[in-house]
Amino acid sequence: MSDDHRRSVSSVPTVHLLGAFALHTGGETIPLPVDSRRLVAYLAVHSRPQPTAALAADLWPGVRPQAAARLLDEAVAGVDVPGLLAADDRGRLALGPGVATDLADAMLLIRALSASRIEQRPDVELLEHDILPSWTASWIAVERERFRQLRLSALERLSEGLTAAGRHEDAVQIARRAVSTAPSRERSRRALVEALLAGGDVAGAMHEYEEFQQLLRSSIGATPDSELDRLLVPHDSGWPLGPGLHRPIERWGVGMPG
C-alpha cells in the first residue's frame, strides 16, 4: 500500500456508534458540539437522505418547527469536517458517500454470518455493544433495540454453528457474550448450555440452567417451562449426572413475558 493510499484511507471520516460516540478522521478524534454530535449520530443510524423538517422534528421533539429548523442549521454549521455531511438536490441531508460507520460494518457482519456456514470463529467485536447505550432520545431507542435483537440472534446462530462444527470452546465464548447482554433471554442461555454439554462440561451447563431459573424466579416469581428443561431433564439412568442427581424445580402455570 502506498503512502498516498494510507493517507487517503486514514483521512476517511469514521463515525463510531457502538458503545459510545466518536468521530475519527486522519487518525485523530474530532470533537463536535452536542447538537452536531446528535445530528451526525442520527444520520449514521438512518442511512437514507433525511428531509430536514422531519430530521429537525426528530432531533428536537416538542420544539416549534421554526426553532427546530434554526437548531438544525446551527448543528450543521458545527460539523466542520469536509465530506462528513452531504445534501442531495432536494435538500435532504445524509452522511457523505465516503463516510464509514461501525454500525454499517456490524450489519455487514450480521448478514455474512446469516448467509454462510459457520466452521471458524470470526471476529465479533462489532457485536459486543449496543448503539449509544447512554443516549435516551426516543429516536435512538427503536434503532438500538432493533440492532440489539439482530446482534443477539447473530451471536446465537454463530454459537450454534460452532457447536455443530465441534468447536465447543469457541461456541461457549460466543454464547457467553450473548448471555452477558441478555441474561434472561432463553435462546442465548440455551446456546450456552448446548455448547457446554457438547464439550462435556455438564456441571457448567447445570450452573447456567440453575442461574437462569433463579433469574426468572427473581424477576417474574416463577420458572415457566422452557427448551432448557428438555436439554437437562434426565430421560433414563444414562443421563450424564446419573440417576437421582437432577433436582427438579417447581413449575408454575405462567407464560414468559413478551
Regions found by a protein language model. Name each.
Residues M1-V12:
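Basic, amphipathic DNA-recognition helix from helix-turn-helix-like DNA-binding domains
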Residues S2, E28-P33, V45, W60-L71, ...:
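Intrinsically disordered, charged and Pro/Gly-enriched terminal/linker segments
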Residues P13-H16, L84-D89:
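Short beta-strand
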Residues L17-R37:
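A structural micro-motif at secondary-structure boundaries
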Residues L23, L55, V79, A205, ...:
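Conserved RecA-like P-loop NTPase ATPase core
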Residues Y42, D58-G62, G78, P82:
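Amphipathic alpha-helical regulatory segments at dimerization interfaces
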Residues Y42-L55:
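Short capping segments at the starts of secondary-structure elements
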Residues D73-L84, Q213:
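C-terminal flanking helix
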